[in-house]
């Protein structure tokens, strides 16, 4: 499929909207009430610090809703305002936040069901409204919705669209796209759908394996087994790694994306000589500003003397997971929760350790004065951060009283 021609035609369709419906002021009031927090604003104005009894909270200087997420949520609210009586669907979670997705359900916005790992778009009627989430949607999904004559409301983050543009540039030069991301993540599924040839690498270890294969060859069957589900149909590592372009899932670790890009650059220079680099390697900066800012902000917190970190965000949120990863790498006890309800008591917290299932841990909140570093992922509203702060303070007060 000519994906560039398809998306160009789709955007000209009268059934396509990515600008909203003129209800911005009304929606802003609703979102202020639902997601903003006076307490959080006060903490920002107090050098991102709150002192309550034995608890000192140190907030990262950038956290929570990013511009792309806020835009996506606002467009969903606008869509319900504009189509008060029509059936509205979301093709996936709007964002990776359980409370916001519940708000969508409370507005009688339904989610396209997933059956045996596949989205069942047959439930959407020809005149239904379908919202594409902040992560975007695959070309194939958009084609289905266009063919069904659905009203498409596209809330894809512009940073994600920027990555798609890079993929189109790779494709124009017949390069294979090397995508730094998680092959099962909604954004990476959407991004890879724009490529003719692609390979998804999760981390530096996988990137090093690929680069070693480029330089020295290897066992083709082993390669394909190692990257099962992470490459395009018909991909051949012996033929399709001679010209590569770098792209990324926007929520991956900035430093790792940069290191992977440099590794492939060095590899192609070594394989084909420096003067031939441009014929074999492309890299465009597609690291999301919001992701970078939140990672830089938590790094700034590490200069403080912290007893522990609490990281708030959906358990399936990639950008939140990477914030958690940074805290752990800096040797700080860290707890990833998706809301204040996970703080069960002064002694118990339900959280998701890095790379593991949700569990309950004991002894998470130290005795005596405690300094808690706190941040949240790009899909987490300020109100969820306030609720968590209040719960932590309340747990300490129980002991003091």
Curated annotation (Swiss-Prot):
Binding residues for (2E)-4-hydroxy-3-methylbut-2-enyl diphosphate: 96, 185, 250, 317-319, 379
Q: Which Gene3D superfamilies match?
A: 3.40.50.11270, 4-hydroxy-3-methylbut-2-enyl diphosphate reductase, catalytic domain
Gene Ontology biological process = dimethylallyl diphosphate biosynthetic process; isopentenyl diphosphate biosynthetic process, methylerythritol 4-phosphate pathway; terpenoid biosynthetic process
Residue numbers binding dimethylallyl diphosphate: 96, 185, 317-319, 379
Name what cofactor the protein needs.
[4Fe-4S] cluster
The record lists isopentenyl diphosphate as bound by: 96, 185, 317-319, 379
Role description: Catalyzes the conversion of 1-hydroxy-2-methyl-2-(E)-butenyl 4-diphosphate (HMBPP) into a mixture of isopentenyl diphosphate (IPP) and dimethylallyl diphosphate (DMAPP). Acts in the terminal step of the DOXP/MEP pathway for isoprenoid precursor biosynthesis.
The entry assigns this protein to a family as follows: Belongs to the IspH family.
The UniProt entry, under HAMAP family, shows:
IspH
This chain belongs to which protein, by name? 4-hydroxy-3-methylbut-2-enyl diphosphate reductase
What species does this protein belong to? Trichodesmium erythraeum (strain IMS101)
């Amino acid at each position: 499929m000519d994906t560039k021609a398809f998306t160009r035609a789709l955007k000209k369709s009268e059934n396509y909207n990515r600008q909203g419906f003129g209800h911005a002021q009304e929606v802003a009031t609703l979102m202020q009430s639902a997601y903003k927090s006076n307490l959080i604003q006060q903490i920002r104005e107090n050098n991102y610090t709150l002192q309550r009894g034995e608890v000192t909270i140190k907030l990262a200087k950038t956290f929570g809703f990013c511009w792309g997420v806020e835009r996506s949520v606002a467009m969903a609210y606008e869509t319900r305002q504009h189509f008060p009586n029509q059936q509205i669907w979301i093709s996936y979670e709007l964002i990776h936040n359980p409370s916001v997705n519940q708000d969508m359900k409370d507005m009688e916005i339904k989610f396209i069901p997933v059956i045996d790992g596949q989205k069942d778009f047959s439930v959407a009627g020809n005149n239904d409204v379908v919202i594409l989430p902040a992560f975007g949607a695959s070309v194939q999904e958009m084609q289905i919705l266009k063919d069904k004559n659905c009203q498409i409301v596209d809330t894809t983050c512009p940073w994600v669209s920027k990555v798609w543009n890079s993929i189109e540039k790779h494709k124009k030069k017949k390069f294979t796209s090397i995508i730094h991301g998680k092959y099962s993540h909604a954004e990476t599924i959407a991004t890879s759908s724009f490529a003719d040839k692609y390979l998804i690498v999760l981390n530096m270890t996988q990137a090093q394996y690929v680069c070693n294969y480029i330089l020295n060859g290897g066992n083709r069957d082993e390669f394909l087994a190692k990257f099962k589900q992470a490459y395009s149909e018909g991909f051949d590592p012996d033929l399709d790694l001679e010209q590569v372009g770098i792209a990324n899932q926007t929520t991956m670790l900035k430093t790792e994306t940069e290191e992977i890009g440099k590794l492939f650059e060095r590899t192609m220079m070594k394989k084909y000589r420096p003067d031939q680099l441009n014929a074999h390697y492309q890299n465009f900066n597609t690291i999301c500003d919001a992701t970078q800012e939140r990672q830089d902000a938590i790094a700034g917190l590490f200069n403080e003397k912290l007893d522990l970190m609490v990281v708030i965000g959906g358990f399936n949120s990639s950008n939140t997971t990477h914030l958690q990863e940074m805290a752990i790498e800096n040797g700080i006890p860290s707890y990833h929760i998706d809301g204040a309800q996970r703080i069960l008591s002064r002694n118990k917290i339900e959280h998701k350790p890095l790379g593991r299932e949700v569990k309950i841990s004991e002894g998470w909140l130290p005795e005596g004065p405690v300094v808690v570093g706190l941040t949240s992922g790009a899909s987490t509203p300020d109100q969820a951060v306030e609720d968590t702060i209040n719960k932590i303070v309340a747990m300490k007060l129980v002991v003091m009283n």
